[in-house]
Design a protein with these regions (language model features):
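A well-ordered secondary-structure block
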Residues: 100-181
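Bacterial Sec-dependent N-terminal signal peptides
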Residues: 1-11
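C-terminal motif of bacterial Sec signal peptides marking the signal peptidase cleavage site
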Residues: 19-23
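Short, well-ordered surface patches within globular domains
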Residues: 33-107, 162
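Alpha-helical transmembrane segments
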Residues: 14-18
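Bacterial signal peptide processing site
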Residues: 25-28
């Protein structure tokens, strides 16, 4: 059990939407105010590398090795447009049906992972751009690792890889992480 607690520390959790995250493979989005599907975002590869590196370093400091996976990052990117919209709805910067949009995001990520014969747990959050630091990531890990660990355990996922999709919009850094087998 101690190993699992250490493993949980390697997972970034959702500072804004953690309580609504579930294992990938969710039930699809609704039609009213649902996921956009066509919204596009520009991924920030430099920030993605920083985000993944921070998670890998943190995990290594807790005895866990997570391999960076471009395939898992691409799965995270599949849900990124809807995650941005959902978090904007949550913080009052957009209108719409948060649950439907978030459901659309998790379905897109789950489908992408499934097509690669992978399973994973997503975690998403947004920081003000000035707050996107390694220290902030560590504080997030410390605050939410227990919840993420529960999701990994319940989904029977042995974390081996990490991927992320990151974009910057209106002074916020939006991050979707996926920890996968």
């Amino acid at each position: 059990m101690k190993m699992w607690k250490k493993l949980a520390a390697c997972v970034l959790a959702a500072a804004m939407a953690l309580t609504l995250l579930t294992a990938c493979g969710g039930g699809g989005g609704g039609s009213t105010g649902g996921g956009s599907g066509s919204n596009s975002v520009v991924r920030d590869k430099t920030k993605e590398d920083q985000a993944i590196s921070s998670v890998q370093e943190y995990a290594a400091n807790h005895g866990v090795t997570l391999e960076k996976s471009d395939a898992v990052s691409n799965a995270a990117a599949a849900g990124l447009p809807d995650v941005v919209r959902a978090l904007d709805i949550q913080r009052g910067a957009a209108s719409g049906d948060y649950m439907a949009v978030f459901s659309s995001a998790t379905t897109a990520m789950g489908n992408s992972l499934y097509s690669q014969k992978k399973a994973g747990v997503p975690a998403c959050f947004a920081y003000k751009e000035a707050d996107f630091t390694k220290d902030t990531i560590v504080r997030t890990l410390n605050a939410y690792s227990g919840s993420i660990m529960d999701q990994l355990t319940n989904a029977k996922i042995s974390p081996e890889t990490v991927g992320a999709a990151v974009t910057v919009k209106d002074g916020y850094v939006y991050i979707v992480y996926i920890i996968a087998n």
